[in-house]
């Protein structure tokens, strides 16, 4: 993760699930569908690289015996261990961590791979995926879709969002800019929280085209079995499907989802 990255939600991981609720279990449903499609038998182990608060792992733990997570941020690791003590959570850099074992499923969600800004960062992260995979392991990753941002109408300079829950109320304004040569998206987000000083986030993300993601995974020993720009496995031209709804993250409908098996 770039050292200039800062986020209210990294400082306060307890707020993450309020800001980004998953009441309909969309991500868990996608994963379970992928297991049925791309694995010969139900998985017995899963590693989530960039696991955040461990919410997805907790969902998957109802049917998967061994659920491991890795996150770069000590704040996320501490929160996940406190709230979800049954999970096996480790702190580490996705470019370098080695757990000394393999898993039936390796996942990397929430744009975590998009934090790998350079080609070498991307390669090293995929090497981490491969180090924890055996032949037939299913890899599931999502990244920000360069087609949507650079070629289509997915780029919006200014996006507003609202969080209105009993525990947390705030509005946000996200300002985006593109570096086309390096295929990077930069986002500055300002939180307006009643009765508190404004809080400013900053992040940079690497944008990947579908063919780049496919080649990256192939070079790391994975064969892509499916790639979509949605969680419903609908075949499209991978240009991205844009939501017009207010969006705190500013990235809804702008992702690629890849499903690949270790050779």
Predicted segments, located by residue:
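Conserved beta-strand signature within the Rossmann-like core of class I S-adenosyl-L-methionine
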Residues: 136-143
């Amino acid at each position: 993760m770039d050292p200039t990255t800062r986020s209210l939600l990294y400082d306060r991981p307890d707020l993450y699930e309020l800001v980004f609720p998953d009441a309909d279990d969309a991500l868990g449903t996608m994963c379970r569908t992928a297991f049925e499609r791309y694995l010969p038998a139900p998985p017995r182990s899963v590693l989530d690289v960039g696991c955040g608060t461990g919410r997805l792992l907790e969902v998957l733990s109802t049917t998967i015996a061994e659920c491991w997570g890795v996150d770069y941020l000590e704040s996320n690791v501490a929160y996940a261990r406190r709230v979800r003590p049954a999970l096996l959570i480790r702190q580490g850099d996705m470019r370098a961590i080695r757990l000394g074992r393999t898993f039936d499923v390796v996942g990397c969600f929430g744009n975590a791979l998009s934090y790998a800004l350079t080609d070498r960062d991307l390669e090293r992260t995929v090497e981490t995926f491969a180090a924890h995979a055996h032949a037939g392991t299913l890899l599931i990753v999502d990244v920000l879709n360069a087609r949507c941002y650079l070629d289509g109408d997915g780029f919006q300079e200014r996006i507003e969002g609202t969080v209105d829950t009993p525990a947390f109320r705030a509005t946000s304004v996200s300002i985006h800019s593109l570096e086309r040569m390096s295929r990077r998206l930069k986002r500055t987000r300002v939180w307006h929280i009643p009765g508190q000083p404004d809080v400013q986030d900053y992040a940079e993300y690497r944008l990947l085209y579908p063919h780049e993601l496919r080649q990256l995974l192939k070079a790391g020993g994975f064969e892509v079995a499916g790639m979509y720009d949605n969680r419903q496995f609908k075949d499209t031209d991978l240009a991205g499907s844009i939501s017009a709804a207010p969006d705190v993250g500013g990235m809804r409908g702008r992702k690629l989802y890849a499903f690949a098996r270790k050779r």
